[in-house]
Amino acid sequence: MQQAQAQGLPPATTGDITPEPVREGIDLIVNGERFRHTGDPLMPLLWYLRDVLRLTGTKLGDAHGEDGYDLVLVNGKAVSAIKRPMAKLAGARVTTVEGLAHADGSLHPLQQAFIDEDAIGCGYCTPGWLIAGIDLLTRKPKPSDEDIDKLPNRCRCGVQTRVRRAIKRAAGAKA
């Protein structure tokens, strides 16, 4: 306090101290629609999507984001929604599995390829596979089997071979 007075500053009062800054909100776009999150900035994106927006396609798997179940596109890149806090999403464009279809209702080519190749087991991992596949096809339009096998997704139903065929079909490559 003496140091503040020596610098010509008025002494602090308890009314001058705030435990955390006032939050105006985190603006983001989810599946083409604008939203403002005014809650906890440390809330993981996964819980915002599922609990606030009621977009339940993105799943929780191992709670560490290592299994690919929770993948979403953030500014066009696949990221783990459980690892991404809302504070890191200001101005971001988020696409979930619910936002992959076109405005006219037609499916994304990878969604159609999953249907055509019967690449759906129980369906729990399917949203993550779709997001990871779209990210891969954006980076590598003609992915190899090895590229596809390196995706972080896990499946307990054993559809990996059909997923590989679906991704190659969507890429226009021969399975």
Where do the protein language model's features map onto the residues?
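Signature of N-terminal electron-transfer/Fe-S-associated modules in redox systems
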Residues: 1-175
